[in-house]
């Protein structure tokens, strides 16, 4: 592993206004290159806020955050963000939605088309490249969103409940898909979810926050081998980790 952490939180606190109580307090966390770390916690505990701080979308009230040794405002080219909503532009085709990030970088049309084609093949959407978002399923829209996020070749992928709107079957499929893509790209992932099973399936480590203010209450190492497939969910080892995480989440909620 690199001597420079991919993400480093040092005693981070966040208030949205000076008179507000803190949303986050005393956050210390180190995430190494290539880790898949998921944040779990009750609603309102600051999970999404942590991602926004890393992305530089919100200022830190106190403490420090570094992304590959840089302050978030200087690390934006290293980061891509995938939100719960796919936020595709309805007047652009799938191909042109993915190409948008490349156009913003002023890449040549030939380069943009080549990169877009490769990414659509990677996420299994070459057959809908000329379709518009209205013709896509929820899972397909999320794949387009992920392909667009990968277009700039990020080191770090921030994912804020990206599969929350999907049914269970499609959610499980997308869980496998994101692990397959990560295997090919070797990026670091910081992921937010409310699903304990999803967190255990995806992650190398799970961080559980307690609320009011959000603090790190527990950390779980998920010692399950990659690559992971849906059959993992049927194993005793998986059930044991899900039960452990659920118990710790309940404890954090009561804290």
Predicted regions and their residues:
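Helix-to-loop junction immediately C-terminal to a conserved catalytic motif
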Residues: 55
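Conserved ABC ATPase "signature" region
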Residues: 99, 103, 110-127, 180
